[in-house]
Regions:
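P-loop NTPase nucleotide-binding core
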Residues: 1-146
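The catalytic "switch" region of P-loop NTPases
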Residues: 101-244
Length: 244
């Protein structure tokens, strides 16, 4: 379904909702990634310390807690709330508290949870515009920590932004796109690949990218250039004909 690009928080929710792994293409990936992340931590602990999680349970749990804290240090610098939620998820899974674990998953998906659950998780806020970008960066860091190469985000049919009734909404959407481009260019989304698709009208009409000059300056290319540079920000695709 269409994602309102003018709302960062909705973009994040759609990313989480549609995120998949190569091995589980039909199942939402968030819970899978968290479990794989914990499993990787366990494997590291057992290998480095040469211990058995059952026979040496007390030592194993102590080492796991140290490892979790070490892994969450960098994540906490991006979003302390996100790191606290992951920490709570681990503790809940350790003691079999499925209610809290599911609450963490709901919060990470961008769903609103009760104040009491937020206190349990030690998170101050729910997902909102001001923290959505940090959440996108945090989930990308978690993916890397879990052993994935990174995150691919595909935003299709960007031309729908042209149909937004309010000019302010279109401007917000294009400004958000400009922000994504600048952050990616400045390595703000390390190991994250963005692919956008849209029509020629999106590039060339006044309700399209031209309406926000800073964005248009970043992505405009010579459509008639016969040499196709795959490193340029926009690549025009040839239209299909009957033979194709």
């Amino acid at each position: 379904s269409e994602t309102p690009l003018n709302k960062f928080e909705e973009v994040y929710k759609k990313i989480i909702e549609n995120m998949r792994t190569p091995e589980n293409k039909k199942v939402p990936a968030l819970a899978i990634i968290l479990e794989e992340w914990l499993l990787k931590m366990e494997e590291i602990i057992c290998e480095v310390n040469d211990i058995d999680p059952i026979d040496d349970e007390e030592i194993f749990l102590a080492e796991m807690e140290k490892r979790i804290e070490m892994e969450l240090t960098d994540l906490g610098k991006v979003s302390s709330n996100f790191a606290n939620a992951i920490r709570t998820y681990y503790k809940a899974k350790t003691v079999g508290d499925n209610v809290t674990a599911q609450a963490v998953l709901a919060w990470l998906k961008g769903e609103k949870i009760s104040l009491s659950l937020k206190k349990t998780m030690n998170v101050a806020v729910n997902l909102e515009r001001s923290n959505a970008i940090l959440f996108i960066k945090a989930i990308n860091m978690l993916l890397k920590s879990a052993g994935y190469s990174g995150l691919v985000i595909i935003m299709d049919e960007l031309e729908t932004v042209r149909n937004y009734v309010k000019k302010s909404s279109r401007d917000e959407a294009y400004e958000n796109l400009r922000y994504f481009i600048d952050e990616a260019d400045g390595n703000g989304f390390e190991n994250c690949f963005f692919l956008y698709s849209g029509t020629t009208e999106l590039m060339e009409t006044e309700r399209g990218f031209k309406s926000l000059e800073p964005l248009y300056q970043r992505i405009k290319v010579d459509k008639e250039d016969k040499f196709r540079n795959l490193r340029q920000p926009v690549i025009y695709l040839k239209e299909f004909n009957n033979s194709k």
